Amino acid sequence: MSVRAAVVGLGWAGRELWLPLLREHADFEVVAAVDADPASRQAFTKATGIPTHAAVSALTAREVDLAVVAVPNYLHTEVAGALLATGISVFLEKPVCLNSAEIDVLAAAERSGGMLLAGSAARYRGDVGALRRLLPELGEIRHVALGWIRARGVPRAGGWFTQREKAGGGALYDLGWHLLDTLAFLLGPAAFTQVIGVTSDDFVNAGAWRAAWRQDQLGADAADVEDTARGFLVRDDGVSVSLRASWASHQARDVSVIHVEGSAGTADLRCTFGFSPNREPEPVLSVTREGTTTRLPVPLERIGVEYTRQVSDLAAMLADPGHRGRAVAEARPIVSMIENFYASAGSARGRGAVPAYQ
């Protein structure tokens, strides 16, 4: 029997990403959508024939098995918590929530209601899977360097995405969460015992550095979040982690990099996460031992196939009671780390933005 799904939020992610994925998948039937904007609801129903509602209170567990929540970050906990409380299971991509208090709210709602599912699609990439399978050959893992660095990729500058009150933060929440979730997939989840971070915002208010491929409109307000976050972290298993998340930079293409150092060798993956067309030509995975670097085969996949795999996994996860509580357990150390990261960045002596790149 198909999973009856509702899409909550008809912005870019809900409309262009999750809706097509769910409608094209044999395990799901999209039975409803929710959006506060009347025009969006009208256009959606006219185009799809699927009924829409103004609020999640119109959804019930008798009619909906799973709600895919794609609303602005600051609404994640309010919306997901309300759905869970009615017995409807919820999928959130990232960020699951914005702070530790919110993760407690979601944990309580899940204990008495529906199941919370979460996770980045990056862990479903074929090249990331190949890297994970390689890790046992590297011996004891000592250090991981993670980066997602866009050339020109500021999302909707001036909109909610770049307003701290609504987004929670900038590139660290948007791109960094994917990297940290991928780290947990590679090494297993762990708390971070040491966190040092700095942020900068040289590009975020320069229109020329926005993500043109998203076709976002510029907002009226100046952005007050970082476009770049750089940090050094230590996990409670002793593995050190360097992290860089950047919406914009001076490089030519958008790139995602994972470098793993072990006692018996190192591994490097260079690719491009997400949907940007300004990407690396192909993923490159290599291993280095005793001065010799060997390139390893990785699958060439269509852009976005990781999201298709993620949706395929959702139905199985929903049917497995063992997944209850897992999303909260994996999100909690990430949320705590981000809180400590921003605290560290706030205590650093600020040098101010240099918005010279117009």
Swiss-Prot record:
Any Pfam family matching the protein: GFO_IDH_MocA
Keyword Membrane attributed: no
Gene3D superfamilies reported in the protein's UniProt record: Dihydrodipicolinate Reductase, domain 2, NAD(P)-binding Rossmann-like Domain
Knockout or disruption consequences: Cells lacking this gene are unable to produce rifamycin B, but production can be restored to wild-type levels by supplementation of the culture with 3-amino-5-hydroxybenzoate (AHBA).
GO-annotated molecular function: nucleotide binding; UDP-3-dehydro-alpha-D-glucose dehydrogenase activity
Listed EC numbers: 1.1.1.-
The reaction(s) this protein catalyses: UDP-alpha-D-glucose + NAD(+) = UDP-3-oxo-alpha-D-glucose + NADH + H(+)
GO biological process: antibiotic biosynthetic process
Keywords, in A-Z order: Antibiotic biosynthesis, NAD, Oxidoreductase
Pathway: Antibiotic biosynthesis; rifamycin B biosynthesis
InterPro entries membership: Gfo/Idh/MocA-like_OxRdtase_N, Gfo/Idh/MocA_Oxidoreductases, GFO_IDH_MocA-like_dom, NAD(P)-bd_dom_sf
Function as written in the Swiss-Prot or TrEMBL entry: In a complex with RifK, RifL may catalyze the oxidation of UDP-glucose to UDP-3-keto-D-glucose, which would then be used by RifK to produce UDP-kanosamine. Is not able to use dTDP-glucose as substrate.
Subunit and partners: Interacts with RifK.
Descriptive protein name: Putative UDP-kanosamine synthase oxidoreductase subunit
Gene from which this protein is expressed: rifL
